[in-house]
Amino acid sequence: MSGENICAVRCEIFILHRRHLPYDEEWLLDTARRKDWLKPEGTPLYCLGNLLAYSGMFVSRKYNSTLEDIRHAIQIDNDVVVGVDREKLYAEEVDLEDLTNHAVVVTHLEDDSVTIFDPYQEPYISKIPLADFLHAWNESHNYMIQVLQSVDEYVPHPINVDNIPLAGDLEELEEAIAENAHDVWAKARMEEGWVYGKERDDERKEHPDLVPYTALPDSEKEYDRQMAFNTIKLVKKLGFDIVKRNG
């Protein structure tokens, strides 16, 4: 365990403890490693909360979150974990690069400060100036997970990508993603025993869309294209570049 970045696991353990739920730390760590949620450099954002979900809790994830999102979650007694650049949280730390390298639990929010549980800080519970918290949180695109009390609290929050422009040369990629998504879906259905039928029949496992992508009705093609379109825009929204190699 020496040198291993397990801050996310400890944040999830903190929540299990706060909710008076039984846990075994070594088992949780072993599970996270075995399922590749815990990597040598730490837990990726997209795996944050997986141990809680694996333990039967309902975990909702969101990019571009706001302080109001955190405030509302705390008010209804939900737990909040955020991804941050740890060195930006503390004035005495040397911040050598901009990156998301840490997870903390937000336990209280005031007008000028944020109280957090930081598993790598003494004491574990610290009050951070609001400006420092926002600076550190911004590195993860304001990523947070919220641990719900029940599934009834779940509200979908797709990332808004309306303001992301796409170059015309990405149309080929958009169409390729759309057609591939259809092929992936069709292959999975066929492996489950589904066949083509003029109308959907769940008992007979017949589906009218089990045809080549080119034979799909325009409405279904548009659904796949919109998914591809939003996927490409999401990639750009989160700071990734799409580069086409020659050859």
Regions found by a protein language model. Name each.
Residues 29, 71, 134-135, 222:
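Generic structural signal for individual residues within well-ordered alpha-helical segments
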Residues 154-247:
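Alpha-helical propensity feature that highlights long, continuous alpha-helices across diverse contexts
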Residues 62-119:
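Active-site-adjacent substructure of cysteine-protease-like catalytic cores
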Residues 37-41, 91-93, 97-98, 107-153:
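Noncatalytic regulatory segments and standalone regulatory/sensor domains
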Residues 58, 79, 241:
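Residue-level detector of anion-binding/catalytic polar loops
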Residues 1-64, 76, 151-153:
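Cysteine-nucleophile protease catalytic domains, especially the papain-like/related folds used
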